[in-house]
Amino acid sequence: MKTFVAKPETVKRDWYVVDATGKTLGRLATELARRLRGKHKAEYTPHVDTGDYIIVINADKVAVTGRKETDKLYYWHTGYVGGIKQATFKEMIARRPEAVIEIAVKGMLPKGPLGRAMFRKLKVYAGAEHQHAAQQPQVLDI
């Protein structure tokens, strides 16, 4: 008996919607990364993108434990000399709440072309509305 290897053209991808209200950031991101990779499926193949599409709503209501709301820092560089910037979790939620979940999930995905393809299947929205109703996403309770 030969080992099953999934082919990119035969992979069936479903659409799911996840409500991030009150969910802990790290625990939510771990499950999202697992499902984006396709590790929850029996036909998972490491070198093939077998994951599903995931829509995250209410990203502005995601929670963190402890004092991370004020102590956790996000860094980025503008590209100019001395252009290192930083913001706390609270400031990031106020400025761009989608980025908090995107950064957490992106760090848990493989680095390289396959990881970037997996990341493109993640759609994050700050509010309760999303523009993917035509895909008829199923509610995923994490």
Curated annotation (Swiss-Prot):
A GO BP annotation: translation
UniProt keyword list: Ribonucleoprotein, Ribosomal protein
UniProt cross-references to PROSITE patterns, sorted A to Z: RIBOSOMAL_L13
GO cellular component: cytosolic large ribosomal subunit
A matching Pfam family: Ribosomal_L13
SUPFAM superfamilies membership: Ribosomal protein L13
Molecular function via GO: mRNA binding; structural constituent of ribosome
Task performed by this protein: This protein is one of the early assembly proteins of the 50S ribosomal subunit, although it is not seen to bind rRNA by itself. It is important during the early stages of 50S assembly.
NCBIfam families hit by this protein: rplM_bact (TIGR01066)
Family: Belongs to the universal ribosomal protein uL13 family.
PANTHER family the record matches: LARGE RIBOSOMAL SUBUNIT PROTEIN UL13M (PTHR11545:SF2), RIBOSOMAL PROTEIN L13 (PTHR11545)
Subunit text: Part of the 50S ribosomal subunit.
UniProt protein name: Large ribosomal subunit protein uL13
Protein source organism: Haemophilus influenzae (strain PittEE)
